[in-house]
């Protein structure tokens, strides 16, 4: 039994597209994820964990709180695709341990396959401090302006700005800063930073004192940027030229 944890339906969908002969597989995900897989006719999917198949994909809703019953200790794989899905990062100190804890009968092995992205944008604690302070100032100014003006145009634009902005995810239902949501903001950025360096990610695993850790780094003939270009961005002619060039390079290796 193999259990694969990846918080990206697009990444999971790509497995089915790239390995069409993949059989005995099921994806456990949200209703939205099920719809995307259904549109692509991608094997079995479920919102509830029932009987496991030989290969089982899980999105983040199954990272914690839910026991996963397996007839035998499974091989567990984490996948973090930093070029196609930055939300697929996994925190070694929390999520990785929580996932393993879901298997009450233990696991056979744990493997984390991750791409490292040195140019990944992530904020330091100081930068987050500045962002929150600046966003709070602007947001509160909007609210003050709204109480002072009776001009319909001003009120309309201020209400639109107050009702939809990037500061709202860190406020509670009363419009006040939510300490838990803000703390989560810091944590997410710290975890993203781990994936800018192999050393940072490996050190994070070692510091948990939970895993018997070993590391293997592989440089692939086709980079993630090239893979994304082939899949999405290039015109057919350019895509074909890139594929031919990479095949020629691989023959010389």
Question: PLM features: what roles do these ranges have?
Answer:
Residues 1, 20-22, 44-53, 68-72, ...:
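Flexible, charged surface loops at secondary-structure boundaries
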Residues 5-8, 57-60, 79, 113-116:
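Short His-Asn-centered micro-motif
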Residues 54-76, 96-106:
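SF2 helicase motor core recognition
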Residues 83-110:
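Conserved SF2 helicase motif VI
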Residues 130-253:
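The feature captures the C-terminal accessory region of ATP-dependent helicases
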């Amino acid at each position: 039994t193999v259990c694969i944890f990846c918080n990206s339906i697009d990444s999971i969908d790509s497995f089915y597209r790239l390995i069409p002969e993949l059989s005995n597989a099921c994806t456990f995900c949200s209703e939205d994820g099920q719809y995307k897989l259904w549109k692509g006719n991608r094997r079995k999917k479920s919102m509830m964990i029932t009987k496991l198949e030989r290969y089982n994909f899980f999105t983040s809703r199954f990272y914690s709180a839910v026991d996963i019953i397996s007839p035998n200790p499974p091989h567990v794989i984490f996948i973090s695709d930093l070029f196609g899905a930055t939300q697929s990062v996994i925190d070694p100190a929390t999520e990785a341990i929580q996932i393993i804890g879901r298997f009450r009968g233990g696991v056979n092995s744990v493997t984390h396959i991750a791409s490292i992205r040195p140019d990944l944008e992530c904020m330091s604690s100081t930068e987050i401090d500045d962002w929150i302070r600046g966003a709070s100032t602007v947001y509160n100014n909007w609210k003050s302006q709204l109480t002072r003006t009776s001009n319909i145009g001003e009120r309309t634009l201020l209400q639109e700005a107050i009702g939809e902005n990037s500061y709202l995810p860190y406020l509670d239902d009363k419009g006040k800063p939510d300490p838990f949501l803000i703390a989560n903001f810091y944590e997410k950025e710290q975890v993203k930073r781990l994936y800018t360096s192999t050393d940072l990610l490996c050190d994070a695993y070692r510091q948990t004192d939970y895993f018997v850790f070993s590391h293997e780094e592989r440089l692939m003939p086709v980079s993630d940027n090239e893979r994304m270009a082939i899949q999405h961005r290039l015109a057919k002619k350019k895509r074909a030229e890139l594929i031919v060039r990479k095949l020629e390079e691989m023959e010389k290796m």
